């Protein structure tokens, strides 16, 4: 998770002219419009919508309901900064064919330079979409930095594989 945090910070510096998304829809639009800096991909799982939804909701909460504390120290051991990031996984059933999963992050102990939306910065949007037959589509939107492993894990969970939480 610490690697993911550093990736997010790095992405913020690299994306200079891209403002932080203020909504889930803005996160999706930003990911689609900046493919070199984002992941906006789709995966089709050969499993029933209900089965995929149960698995992903369980893993979403297990893997992403975390807090990460970062402490920076000098070579002499003096602490120069300490802050805590809390990740907030959210799940919303839109209808019988769509579930929206959103990951937001709040930071304590650090001055944020950009406006932070209610609930925290938008980190990941994952849509679970019912397809015909026993198939389900996953639509993933995030920064490319630090989230490739998260997307790979989500695809495998969608396929019914029991892989561990990504470590970032």
Where is each model-derived feature located?
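Ser/Thr-rich, low-complexity intrinsically disordered terminal regions
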Residues: 18-168
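Compositionally biased amphipathic helical and low-complexity segments enriched in hydrophobic
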Residues: 6-7, 99
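Positively charged n-region of N-terminal signal peptides that target proteins for export
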Residues: 1-4
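C-terminal motif of bacterial Sec signal peptides marking the signal peptidase cleavage site
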Residues: 13-16
């Amino acid at each position: 998770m610490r690697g993911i945090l550093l990736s997010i910070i790095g992405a913020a510096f690299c994306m200079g002219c891209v403002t932080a998304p203020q909504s889930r829809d803005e996160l999706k639009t930003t990911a689609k419009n900046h493919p070199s800096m984002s992941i906006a991909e789709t995966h089709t799982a050969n499993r029933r919508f209900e089965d995929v939804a149960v698995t992903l909701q369980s893993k979403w909460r297990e893997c992403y309901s975390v807090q990460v504390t970062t402490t920076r120290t000098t070579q002499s051991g003096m602490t120069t900064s300490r802050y805590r990031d809390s990740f907030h996984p959210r799940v919303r059933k839109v209808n019988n064919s769509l579930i929206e999963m959103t990951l937001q992050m709040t930071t304590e102990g650090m001055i944020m330079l950009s406006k932070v939306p209610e609930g925290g910065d938008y980190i990941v949007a994952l849509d679970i979409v019912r397809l015909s037959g026993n198939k389900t589509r996953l639509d993933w939107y995030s920064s490319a930095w630090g989230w490739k492993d998260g997307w790979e894990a989500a695809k495998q969970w969608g396929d019914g594989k029991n892989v561990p939480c990504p470590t970032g």
